Amino acid sequence: MNKKDTCEIFCYDEEKVNRIQGDLKTIDIVSVAQMLKAIADENRAKITYALCQDEELCVCDIANIIGITVANASHHLRTLHKQGIVRYRKEGKLAFYSLDDEHIRQIMMIVLEHKKEVNVNV
């Protein structure tokens, strides 16, 4: 077992632990985790990236861009919508999707930039 990345003795900073535990009780970390989990799916990450590149895309465009069926794209878009990542508007029989706000674009761009800086293999 590689012990280079772990403490060799058990001790902790009680003040830091108590402060951060208190902070965690005041935020909705479960919702944050659910939002990040939604984007963590490969197809949903591709959809999010596509919507970073163009302000608004219809479901058919998205399906073609990432190479899945319209039904599958709709399923992924519903998941993203439920998590507040995308919004949509109807125009006749077409549904157009966009990112919910600039924060989502920033998150995606920051993660992409970070990926360039670190050597992480999946």
Swiss-Prot record:
Residues 24-119 form the HTH arsR-type domain. Cd(2+) binds at residues 7, 11, 58, 60. It holds the Pfam family HTH_5. CDD domains: HTH_ARSR (cd00090). Keywords: Cadmium, Cadmium resistance, DNA-binding, Metal-binding, Plasmid, Transcription, Transcription regulation. Homodimer. Metal-binding repressor for the cad operon. Involved in resistance to heavy metals, such as cadmium, bismuth, zinc or lead. Metal binding causes the repressor to dissociate from the DNA. This is Cadmium resistance transcriptional regulatory protein CadC. It comes from Alkalihalophilus pseudofirmus (strain ATCC BAA-2126 / JCM 17055 / OF4) (Bacillus pseudofirmus).
